[in-house]
Amino acid sequence: MSFRGGGGGRGGGFNRGGGGGRGGGFGGGRGGGFGGGRGGGFGGGRGGRGGFNRNQDYGPPEYVVALGEFMHPCEDEIVCKCVTEENKVPYFNAPVYLENKEQIGKVDEIFGQLRDFYFSVKLSDNMKASSFKKLQKFYIDPMKLLPLQRFLPRPPGEKGPPRGGRGGGGGRGGRGGGFRGGRGANGGGRGGFGGRGGGFGGRGGGGGGFRGGRGGGGGRGFRGGR
């Protein structure tokens, strides 16, 4: 039961890619927000085209808060453990900073279990994955975080927000309990825990838990999808 994102409808947000579909969360695709699809929550994909012009660079924020700790490089990206207060979830494509507010890249994928998850950072052109130290901290604009409760299943009997038009809000939210697999939490390359039943859902082996990406071994676990 993963919170696997799907594509949105044509509506929702600005341009054509923002929110929508039948799902509970926000819109999916290559640059934008959070997943649609039939299930609630969001998919660990890479955004959509739309989403309130979220990719525009407004410069560094007034202040930043802790986002994560460096775990290991992964090809030309880095994998970090999320350490946000109350397990808040970063937006996809949200800028990631050093403590001095120097931007190092943007959030690319989010994966792992609901209360113990990881994210990858697509680095800026002038940054190298090998230049960071183990457990080095990274930071984010607090306005680029969402509460974890937004992605949890609703209690029985609780009504969701009003249903919109094509690609509006709400609909049938929240079925599952994890994030979609990305590039793996531990280990190099695209490995980590994962596979179809993978715990942290990368593109590698492992088993049990929530659904990952394309990975190898492991039992069926709680398979996501519809």
Curated annotation (Swiss-Prot):
Which GO biological process categories is it annotated with? definitive hemopoiesis; rRNA processing; snoRNA guided rRNA pseudouridine synthesis; telomere maintenance via telomerase
Ranges annotated as biased composition (Gly residues): 162-226
- Pfam families documented for this protein: Gar1 (PF04410)
> Can you name one GO molecular function term for this protein?
box H/ACA snoRNA binding
Q: Where in the cell is it found?
A: Nucleus, Nucleolus
Q: Where are the transmembrane segments?
A: none
Q: What biological function has been recorded for the protein in this entry?
A: Required for ribosome biogenesis. Part of a complex which catalyzes pseudouridylation of rRNA. This involves the isomerization of uridine such that the ribose is subsequently attached to C5, instead of the normal N1. Pseudouridine ('psi') residues may serve to stabilize the conformation of rRNAs.
**Keyword Iron appears in the UniProt entry:** no
Family, per entry: Belongs to the GAR1 family.
Subunit organization:
Component of the small nucleolar ribonucleoprotein particle containing H/ACA-type snoRNAs (H/ACA snoRNPs). Component of the telomerase holoenzyme complex.
Q: Which UniProt keywords apply?
A: Nucleus, Repeat, Ribonucleoprotein, Ribosome biogenesis, RNA-binding, rRNA processing
Could you tell me the superkingdom of the organism this chain comes from? Eukaryota
The organism encoding this protein is: Danio rerio
Q: Where is this region: Disordered?
A: 1-30, 150-226
Q: Which GO terms describe its cellular component?
A: box H/ACA snoRNP complex; telomerase holoenzyme complex
What protein does this entry describe?
H/ACA ribonucleoprotein complex subunit 1
Renumbered to this chain, region (RGG-box 2) spans 163-226
Q: Quick one: where's region RGG-box 1?
A: 4-51
